[in-house]
């Protein structure tokens, strides 16, 4: 899954507002950047969060898997005289780029970037016709590969879980029938079919294709897996007293972050099957409220902020634990490798 001007935006909205990073004030307050500190921005995007961190005197290691974002940030590297390192990398690999003595902070802003949405040739938006691609990097399986090759049952699971689509079976079966005649090549091909199969009703607030496009983007880029790996990598890479700040725009992503901080709080959750579970040392403690949403004022000024949620944790002195992906309760979906051309 990964920007507004700091990182990401929800993909159901319009054009970019790169001068308004979502929850910027709250992110900086949670990170507490200062001279001498090293902060890793795992989702550089257009550099909004990175610039705000640099403005506080901290040094920044910024990552982005998108080569276009890296190229766009080179001027910022030059302008900041060695305090910014900009690296093309998935944020799940952040531990590889952390200094040996650890990081003072990590910020992750999860989702697709405004720049990516704006470029029709990237294929992220049904509002702009282009190749059905959706890859955040330049390699790997595209959305067209998934739509044209995946089994109907796999499409149903992808649309239903990753997109929370209410009629995944109806759409998947229509795709199967249509692709037998000719393959899907463009965003308009897919969006047009979905509009026919599940036409928009007067009460609907979003386009009929919104959830399917979201599901494909999340699947193609393994966004939930990337996020889960990045959280464990941050746990290993932060110094005691280091801060992990994560901004999400969708309930699936927020659920993963919430479960991570809950598991790493050290307070075990018992059940009727296993009522007595031993507490473990806390690896993260909450910073402020467990969850922060955008203010009414920010949501009005920047519609993308309406769905944004911020969660933050303070790294304790407890040693990192083994990465246990079962805590996220993610379903087994189809293999991307089997869908390549």
Curated annotation (Swiss-Prot):
It comes from the Bacteria. One of its GO terms (biological process) is rRNA base methylation. It is an enzyme of class 2 (transferase). InterPro entries: RsmH, SAM-dep_MeTrfase_MraW_recog, SAM-dependent_MTases_sf. It catalyses: cytidine(1402) in 16S rRNA + S-adenosyl-L-methionine = N(4)-methylcytidine(1402) in 16S rRNA + S-adenosyl-L-homocysteine + H(+). S-adenosyl-L-methionine binds at residues 47-49, 64, 91, 109, 116. It is found in: Cytoplasm. Its EC number is 2.1.1.199. Keywords: Cytoplasm, Methyltransferase, rRNA processing, S-adenosyl-L-methionine, Transferase. SUPFAM superfamilies: Putative methyltransferase TM0872, insert domain, S-adenosyl-L-methionine-dependent methyltransferases. GO terms for molecular function: rRNA (cytosine-N4-)-methyltransferase activity. GO terms for cellular component: cytoplasm. Belongs to the methyltransferase superfamily. RsmH family. Specifically methylates the N4 position of cytidine in position 1402 (C1402) of 16S rRNA. NCBIfam families: 16S rRNA (cytosine(1402)-N(4))-methyltransferase RsmH. This is Ribosomal RNA small subunit methyltransferase H. It comes from Agrobacterium fabrum (strain C58 / ATCC 33970).
């Amino acid at each position: 899954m990964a920007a507004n001007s700091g990182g990401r935006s929800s993909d159901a909205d319009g054009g970019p507002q790169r001068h308004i990073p979502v929850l910027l004030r709250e992110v900086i307050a949670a990170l507490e950047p200062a001279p001498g500190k090293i902060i890793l921005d795992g989702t550089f995007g257009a550099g909004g969060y990175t610039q705000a961190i640099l403005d506080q005197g901290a040094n920044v290691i910024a990552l982005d898997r998108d080569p276009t974002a890296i190229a766009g940030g080179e001027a910022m590297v030059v302008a900041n005289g060695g305090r910014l390192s900009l690296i093309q990398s998935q944020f799940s690999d952040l531990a590889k780029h952390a200094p040996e003595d650890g990081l003072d902070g990590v910020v992750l802003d999860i989702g697709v970037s405004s720049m990516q949405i704006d470029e029709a040739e990237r294929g992220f938006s049904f509002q702009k016709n282009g190749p059905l691609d959706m890859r955040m990097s330049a390699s790997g399986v595209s959305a067209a590969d998934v739509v044209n090759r995946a089994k109907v049952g796999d499409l149903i699971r992808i649309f239903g879980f990753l997109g929370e689509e209410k009629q995944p079976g109806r759409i998947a079966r229509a795709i199967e029938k249509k692709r037998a005649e000719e393959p899907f090549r463009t965003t308009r091909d897919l969006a047009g079919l979905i509009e026919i199969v599940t036409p928009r009703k007067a009460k609907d607030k979003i386009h009929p294709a919104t959830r399917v496009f979201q599901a494909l983007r999340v699947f193609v880029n393994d966004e939930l897996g990337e996020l889960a790996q990045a959280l464990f990598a941050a746990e290993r890479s932060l110094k005691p007293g280091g801060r992990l700040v994560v901004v999400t725009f969708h309930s699936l992503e927020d659920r993963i972050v919430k479960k991570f901080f809950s598991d790493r709080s050290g307070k075990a959750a018992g059940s009727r099957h296993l009522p007595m579970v031993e507490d473990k040392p806390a690896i993260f403690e909450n910073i402020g409220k467990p969850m922060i949403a955008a203010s009414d004022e920010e949501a009005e000024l920047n519609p993308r902020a309406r769905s944004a949620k911020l969660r933050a944790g303070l790294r304790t002195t407890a040693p990192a634990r083994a990465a246990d992906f079962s805590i996220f309760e993610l379903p087994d979906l189809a293999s991307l490798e089997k869908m390549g051309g």
